[in-house]
């Protein structure tokens, strides 16, 4: 992996499709964006929502980065979906083998959970351990890995709980923070330093705050959001509060993207598209005179 590939993974997970995803969240959960009993204006609330989304997506990006590193080092990546006896599917963060031992990793960005979440995390870890131990026996090794070394709130708890599981299942289990995974498991401490350098470079290249005004780049915004599900557009157009309280105006400042959408929907065949075109036309005339 090089710096360009590293950035590509981060940008793909964190920024690609974020306009469409924001509109989807507004359509499905409008109450999170509207209401007089919020101390923030619509633009600030939208910005807050985007930043929270970036935090979540960062974890997804780091999962792919670790997977690519494992591939580069010669490990075979296995399917991350496993099935419980009741048919419920579980998803592994990392699952791979060196040809002799089978490894699974429960990977999180930081260890800052409260008591209920840390217990839930251990319960989730054991559920995966139970399934995989039946499949691989003593050839299995499990890891709990927190990438950010500055957060280790529940370290003692995890050490104690992993020791209990280790003794019960007879499986090698390890807890790592930050560099420890690269140093003790991968034997590549220099690679950790490289990742830190790449992260700093990537962060330095970002704007101070994400752009919430879709009309700043109307054609680009249009291309991304024109494929949003019809039901989401219907909910947005039917919810007058989103328009009256300025939520949609905070996203579409001058209406230029909405006008492109209106022309697009108006040119498509089918009653739903005509309904959307008519609905957009009414909103444009009312809120962008």
Placement of each model-derived feature along the sequence:
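Interdomain/boundary linker segments immediately adjacent to catalytic/signaling cores
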Residues: 1-69
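N-terminal "first-domain core" detector
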Residues: 65-66, 76-77, 88-92
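Domain-level recognition of nuclease-like catalytic cores that cleave nucleotide substrates
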Residues: 141-232
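Short His-Asn-centered micro-motif
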Residues: 80-81, 107-108, 143-149
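Extended, charged low-complexity segments
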Residues: 197-289
């Amino acid at each position: 992996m090089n710096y360009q590939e590293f950035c590509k993974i981060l940008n793909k997970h964190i920024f690609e499709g974020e306009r469409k995803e924001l509109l989807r969240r507004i359509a499905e959960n409008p109450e999170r964006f509207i209401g007089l009993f919020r101390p923030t204006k619509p633009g600030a609330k939208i910005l807050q929502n985007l930043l929270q989304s970036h935090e979540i997506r960062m974890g997804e990006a780091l999962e792919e980065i670790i997977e690519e590193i494992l591939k580069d080092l010669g490990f075979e990546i296995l399917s991350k979906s496993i099935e419980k006896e009741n048919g419920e599917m579980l998803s592994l963060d990392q699952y791979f083998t060196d040809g002799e031992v089978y490894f699974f990793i429960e990977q999180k960005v930081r260890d800052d959970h409260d008591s209920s979440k840390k217990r839930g995390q251990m319960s989730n870890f054991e559920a995966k351990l139970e399934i995989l131990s039946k499949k691989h026996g003593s050839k299995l090794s499990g890891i709990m890995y927190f990438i950010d070394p500055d957060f280790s709130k529940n370290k003692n708890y995890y050490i104690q709980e992993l020791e209990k599981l280790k003794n019960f299942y007879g499986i090698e289990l390890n807890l790592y923070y930050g560099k420890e995974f690269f140093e003790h498991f991968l034997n590549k401490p220099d690679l950790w330093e490289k990742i830190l350098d790449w992260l700093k470079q990537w962060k330095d290249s970002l704007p101070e705050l994400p752009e919430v005004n879709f009309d700043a780049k109307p054609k680009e915004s249009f291309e991304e959001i024109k494929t949003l599900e019809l039901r989401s557009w219907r909910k947005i157009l039917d919810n007058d509060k989103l328009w009256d309280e300025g939520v949609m105006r905070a996203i579409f400042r001058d209406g230029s993207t909405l006008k492109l959408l209106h022309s697009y929907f108006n040119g498509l065949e089918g009653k739903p598209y005509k309904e959307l075109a008519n609905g957009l036309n009414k909103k444009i005339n009312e809120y962008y005179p």
